[in-house]
Amino acid sequence: MQGKINYKDITQKEMFNEIFKEYVKEEKQIDLGTCDQDSVHDLWRRFVKRWNDGKMKSKWYSLGKRISQPSYARLVGPSRPTLENLQDRRELQEQLNELRKLSRKSAFKSQAKRETELLDEILPKEPAGSKEAMQQKKKEKRAALKHYREASDNEEDLKETDLYGDRDSFQSRLKQKKQRSEFRASKREMERLERDQELRNKIEERNKKELETIEKLRELAKARLQGFSS
């Protein structure tokens, strides 16, 4: 089992700082940069307790084992790092970067799932089980996943709300989308009514012309009959 941490030891806190930050971000969805000093201290105390109780995932202990090695510990002091020290640090940084990437992907999937659920609640629904309903759900889900895949490709531009969700902002966008959808539906209905009215006008105009033609034929026939009888 990984050696225990003394949460009052400043040197150990500095050594485990990167793991601590990544653990809090991945496991608790908390960015230490947004926390005050008291909150950070409380999170560190909880982190140390869980670590010492052996209740963390093995990957955290694997990282801890690396930084606990003497070669890494010497990097904390003022002495000049050796090539071996730098290699250890690069390998540790690569592992931390991989953890960050996995954390982001997990956050993307969770947010996409939440947005899909909100879409199901807010958007007009086709009859349950219908082909249209299934297609609509797939379409909206693909759109949500596409948004977060694109965000994942531009990690440097990400904000915390992109990773962990701004529910009010998303609901506002959904409301606007629903309003646009309703407006388009209303516009289509108005256009349909106008087309129907135009068709009715054409039919009435054609019927009127046919009646006028029939009336003229009747008058012509009547005139011919009168000519025969005279």
UniProtKB/Swiss-Prot annotation:
Residues 136-146 have a biased composition (Basic residues). InterPro entries: SCI-1-like. Residues 118-195 are annotated as: Disordered. PANTHER family: STYLE CELL-CYCLE INHIBITOR 1. It comes from Schizosaccharomyces pombe (strain 972 / ATCC 24843). This is Uncharacterized protein C297.06c. It comes from the Eukaryota. Signal peptide: none annotated. One of its GO terms (cellular component) is nucleus. Residues 160-170, 179-195 have a biased composition (Basic and acidic residues).
